[in-house]
Amino acid sequence: PIEVLKGSPVNAATPEEHPDWADPVSGETETKPTPVVDLPLGATEDRVVGALDIERALTRGEKAFEPGLLARANRGYLYIDEVNLLEDHIVDLLLDVAQSGENVIEREGLSIRHDARFVLVGSGNPEEGELRPQLLDRFGLSVEVKSPNDIEERIEVIRRRAAFEADKSAFLDKWLAEDAKIRAAILTARDKLGTITVPDEALRDCAQLCVAIGSDGLRGELTLLRTAKALAAFEGADVLERDHLRRVASMALSHRLRRDPLDEAGSTARVMRKGLLTVRSSLEGGRHMGCCGVGG
């Protein structure tokens, strides 16, 4: 949950963050669930960024702004299903906003801007089309979802799904304690995150691995480091170890890997292979951190 000003269309936390174009608010705050906003494939540009409030213009003769999905997603999550099928002009809008953290609208005599800081979440079938590299790089982590091959695991999935459909409330009650346990662990990890010690060797390993896979820019190193720190905090560690880097490397870097038409291995396998070679080189050079090698 987040603390917001009552009536703020952009989920502002303080009066200073409340935009000038919006109706005044009292300054009273309320707690609300962190927003999770769906961006449908057929959404128009006006629906995404916002547009002139036609009803207010016609009934009152006032030129007012009607916020879009980006305003609702501020301080929350923006989810896009089939993100690889998103229209190019919407992709361009998202790239601009993701870069600046601000939504700027200048049209129809309006000049509006507001905060638009959100976590971008997307899903899609890569067989239906590729995602533009510029947008793909804006995703911090990438995970390949596959059907389980283990028979017992598949049976358990079927059993749980059947139980959910038979009695949703009973199913949720059954797992309520486990959910609470995970939630508490995440909250504890948030408090501990700032205390994690990061050795210089960890920074070197991040940089070497990103160079080895041909990652452009520094977003790969930063994402890898942040994710490894989050894992270390979640597990209660005090120092970032090489094993933490190893376990999150594929999520942070697989979608940043340069394509090799002659290599039939999946992107995850290629990241782990490059990581193993990188760490071996690091160890041969006399540097050591943690207990495990990347890819080992």
Model-derived features: positions:
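Non-catalytic alpha-helical coupling and interface elements of nucleotide-dependent molecular machines
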Residues: 1, 10, 53-54, 75, ...
